[in-house]
């Protein structure tokens, strides 16, 4: 059964979801880089 043109599914706009995903990814990468650079292993006075 071939779909008619009027029955074609509209795509949802991806922009909002993509932005939220990028924000989450940025936050995770920031936390990972903080641990990687050893900020948490330094004495308490050097912590940001």
UniProtKB/Swiss-Prot annotation:
Free-text tissue specificity from the UniProt record: Testis.
Sorted UniProt keywords: Chromosome, Developmental protein, Differentiation, DNA condensation, DNA-binding, Nucleosome core, Nucleus, Spermatogenesis
Entry's Gene Ontology cellular component terms: nuclear chromosome; nucleosome; nucleus
InterPro entries: Spermatozal_protamine_typ (IPR012601)
Single biological process term from Gene Ontology: mitotic chromosome condensation
GO molecular function, one term: DNA binding
Coiled coil: none
Segments of skewed composition (Basic residues): 1-29
Compartment(s) where it occurs, according to its Swiss-Prot or TrEMBL record: Nucleus; Chromosome
Annotated region described as Disordered, given as residue ranges: 1-48
Primary location group: nucleus
Domain of life per record: Eukaryota
Other remarks on this protein: Two isoforms exist, a major form and a minor form. This is the minor form.
Role played: Protamines substitute for histones in the chromatin of sperm during the haploid phase of spermatogenesis. They compact sperm DNA into a highly condensed, stable and inactive complex.
Protein name: Sperm protamine R3 isoform 2
């Amino acid at each position: 059964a071939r779909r008619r043109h009027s029955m074609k599914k509209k795509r949802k706009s991806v922009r909002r979801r993509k932005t939220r995903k990028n924000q989450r990814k940025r936050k995770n990468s920031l936390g990972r880089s903080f641990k990687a650079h050893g900020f948490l292993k330094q004495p308490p006075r050097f912590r940001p």
